């Protein structure tokens, strides 16, 4: 499902433990880490999509988590041109997401990344609150920052941890004899 502007409705999940660390997962067969996320199906509410994705990708049931809050509106990111499938219809140029902050109230042993027929992730770990902004693929950084800034006060009512500066993604050097434009 893609909206009239070319954005796919989606939910993003920030799962935190009692220490204020967040769940960080590696996509299968890649060195790409991200928060769990997934599309909202037709006739599905964002909260229904949240719990479906949480079970499919992380293996947790609603009883394993406490919903602490969600973003006030959609947060959008555009895909780089090389990732846009321009031959598919409708063309999806990015995602619009409602982000949810969850606290794990069950046992972390309940996490099972292989609960679905097609798992998304092969490894996970707890990381410091701002770590995902440093490590996520560049085109998602702004959305991750906004989601963490908006939802973080629910997890840290006395003040957010200090956010380290985010560096620009490294560019590889051009081949010998080539000049950058």
Swiss-Prot record:
Q: Where is the Nudix hydrolase domain?
A: 6-149
Q: Which Enzyme Commission number(s) are on file for it? A: 3.6.1.-
Output compositional bias ranges, type Basic residues.
Answer: 168-181
Position of sequence motif Nudix box:
38-59
Using the UniProt annotation, give all residue ranges assigned to the region (Disordered): 159-181
> Could you tell me the superkingdom of the organism this chain comes from?
Bacteria
Which cofactors, if any, are listed as required?
a divalent metal cation
Q: GO CC annotations?
A: cytoplasm
Q: Please indicate if the UniProt record lists Kinase as a keyword.
A: no
Q: What keywords are assigned to this protein?
A: Hydrolase
Q: Which CDD domains match?
A: NUDIX_Ap4A_hydrolase_plant_like (cd03671)
What's this protein's family per the entry? Belongs to the Nudix hydrolase family. RppH subfamily.
What role does this protein play?
A: Accelerates the degradation of transcripts by removing pyrophosphate from the 5'-end of triphosphorylated RNA, leading to a more labile monophosphorylated state that can stimulate subsequent ribonuclease cleavage.
Q: What is this protein called?
A: RNA pyrophosphohydrolase
The record lists the organism as Alkalilimnicola ehrlichii (strain ATCC BAA-1101 / DSM 17681 / MLHE-1)
Q: Which gene is annotated as encoding this protein in its UniProt record?
A: rppH
